[in-house]
Amino acid sequence: MPEETHTQDQPMEEEEVETFAFQAEIAQLMSLIINTFYSNKEIFLRELISNSSDALDKIRYESLTDPSKLDSGKELHINLIPNKQDRTLTIVDTGIGMTKADLINNLGTIAKSGTKAFMEALQAGADISMIGQFGVGFYSAYLVAEKVTVITKHNDDEQYAWESSAGGSFTVRTDTGEPMGRGTKVILHLKEDQTEYLEERRIKEIVKKHSQFIGYPITLFVEKERDKEVSDDEAEEKEDKEEEKEKEEKESDDKPEIEDVGSDEEEEEKKDGDKKKKKKIKEKYIDQEELNKTKPIWTRNPDDITNEEYGEFYKSLTNDWEDHLAVKHFSVEGQLEFRALLFVPRRAPFDLFENRKKKNNIKLYVRRVFIMDNCEELIPEYLNFIRGVVDSEDLPLNISREMLQQSKILKVIRKNLVKKCLELFTELAEDKENYKKFYEQFSKNIKLGIHEDSQNRKKLSELLRYYTSASGDEMVSLKDYCTRMKENQKHIYYITGETKDQVANSAFVERLRKHGLEVIYMIEPIDEYCVQQLKEFEGKTLVSVTKEGLELPEDEEEKKKQEEKKTKFENLCKIMKDILEKKVEKVVVSNRLVTSPCCIVTSTYGWTANMERIMKAQALRDNSTMGYMAAKKHLEINPDHSIIETLRQKAEADKNDKSVKDLVILLYETALLSSGFSLEDPQTHANRIYRMIKLGLGIDEDDPTADDSSAAVTEEMPPLEGDDDTSRMEEVD
């Protein structure tokens, strides 16, 4: 109990006022609320409406077992009454009210808040004095008010008034004002600079934002003026108008009825009446408007809600001009209770992955009270495009972001939301046309999910769609790919790159296409990250056709032929490795090439050419990682290609043939380009090509017309062997 500091002994005719000191924690709490939890002042109205809603919940709950509890007031509602003359905002509810003890305890000490806690206590046989606990939200009233008066009436006690100017103490007295019946009236005496909260527009804005889904009607009472047409005499003075009206009525009553046929006297009066001028005056009246007519759609049975209703709610929630693409409406009951209504928009926002921008996608409610709309813990980043509401029965109303991070309840809600989202996507996938629209907009999110969410990776992988070497213009799922696999095919083959045409024409897919093996085309940068985590699908390993050790289905005869080719070109491989030195890790005979002379592949755990390109484009890249991930390049040569065969013969005929070195380097650099890599020194490569062009055109390298810079570079280049231009070109060929 707070310490009672002073009791005034007054004559019996005057009401007794008791003064109490706030507990020390209250002063600290108020400072904490103002400086930490509630930086935006408008939150006070949400908290007070929420408290009213709690009080209404409690009386409604009690009336279930004892209907007579509502005899003191059948209607359950909340009224908001701004008064500009007195600079007060009053919040009135017909809830359970508070006894004197409740007032002293609940508005003088830190009290718990929440309907559920109260109901559990009541079921456990707790004393009735435990009710009406306002919680910390009440003190947020002092963000805008210099003084707060609370008048309350409980069924089991008299009407009392609590008052405090936040000066470390509060007073409690018996209230002799207008009887309330039952409920609580909170009167905020606003600070001079907070009068915006008396404006009709501002109050409506706050209620719509924070409390539009409270389960009881919230009515705003506003004093307004309207024009009323009266005669001049009436306009001059109200009393005269009344007297004149009475006199006219009396005169008309005194007239004999026989004169109703239209005497001269009546006509005169009519003319005089017509001559009287009419004038408009301002008349004051009280306008009542219910602010939360939209009842929470998520609390209704999904079977009773039409798609049009979902559409209207979605548009009001998101301000989107288009209808939603899909919707999931569900509730979870048991140890944990919450309802959720989730929408998939038709298109992704342009700033979907803009991390610095705060998201406003899923609104968190606690028992129909809006808590926050940027709750990162509620849904993983890869599902940040999902719009909707989550309404929990178990979270405390005064929860902060810091508390949310530790909340076990929220972790369970998050798990359920992800599960339901994946169910929704799977249902959507059954409609090919709609899923195509969805995938065009949100495929990156699915792939990001595969990279980040190991728990749901399998389900997410079923949602992937790709172009393949056999799919034409249709995108297919990995499941579709698996159904078309060859009998002896053990792996799922894929290639990453920039465009569909680029990967389709790549040297890496030549032999696979020739053998009728389907190759998946992964042409988005995020595919590289996705496939790093997606190692297998339905027991089949995903294999990149651009990496070393590619295993293709082959019979014994093919294996034997391949071994013979390896032996035949072993020497050339060694010579080429010596020439290229550290540029490549090794040179081997390829089993994947058909029409290309050579290609560059990467080690199993290194980056592909496409990944190297992506990483080089990163502004904040780690150069040390670039060093060891990008260096593992292997040169594969095609033993069936005429260039490689001729080069082998030339190298074996004369190991010291200088043109071999030039040709090997040229082959390597060209293979780098065709395999998707970039050149470290493009100018040197260009100069080699220019020399080939000169030879082709029969231009003498020593031609004095050649510019100095070209000549200087040419001197540095290893010369091509031969005495004349003809022999040189033959070597190149």
UniProtKB/Swiss-Prot annotation:
Gene Ontology CC terms: cytoplasm; cytosol; melanosome; mitochondrion; myelin sheath; neuronal cell body; nucleus; perinuclear region of cytoplasm
Annotated segments matching region Interaction with FNIP2 and TSC1: 285-621
Record flagged with keyword Repressor: no
Localization (cell): Nucleus; Cytoplasm; Melanosome; Cell membrane
Sites where the protein binds ATP: N51, D93, K112, F138, R401
Entry EC number(s): 3.6.4.10
Chief location bin: nucleus
Taxonomy, superkingdom: Eukaryota
PTM characteristics: ISGylated.
Sites bearing Phosphothreonine, chain numbering: T5, T7
Residue numbers of Phosphotyrosine PTMs: Y314, Y493
Location of region: Disordered: 225-279, 700-733
InterPro entries for the chain: HATPase_C_sf (IPR036890), Heat_shock_protein_90_CS (IPR019805), HSP90_C (IPR037196), Hsp90_fam (IPR001404), Hsp90_N (IPR020575), Ribosomal_Su5_D2-typ_SF (IPR020568)
Phosphoserine PTM sites in chain numbering: S231, S252, S263, S454, S477, S642
UniProt record similarity statement: Belongs to the heat shock protein 90 family.
Subunit structure, as described in the record: Homodimer. Identified in NR3C1/GCR steroid receptor-chaperone complexes formed at least by NR3C1, HSP90AA1 and a variety of proteins containing TPR repeats such as FKBP4, FKBP5, PPID, PPP5C or STIP1. Forms a complex containing HSP90AA1, TSC1 and TSC2; TSC1 is required to recruit TCS2 to the complex. The closed form interacts (via the middle domain and TPR repeat-binding motif) with co-chaperone TSC1 (via C-terminus). Interacts with TOM34. Interacts with TERT; the interaction, together with PTGES3, is required for correct assembly and stabilization of the TERT holoenzyme complex.
Function recorded in the entry: Molecular chaperone that promotes the maturation, structural maintenance and proper regulation of specific target proteins involved for instance in cell cycle control and signal transduction. Undergoes a functional cycle that is linked to its ATPase activity which is essential for its chaperone activity. This cycle probably induces conformational changes in the client proteins, thereby causing their activation. Interacts dynamically with various co-chaperones that modulate its substrate recognition, ATPase cycle and chaperone function.
Protein name, as recorded: Heat shock protein HSP 90-alpha
Upper lineage: Eukaryota, Metazoa, Chordata, Craniata, Vertebrata
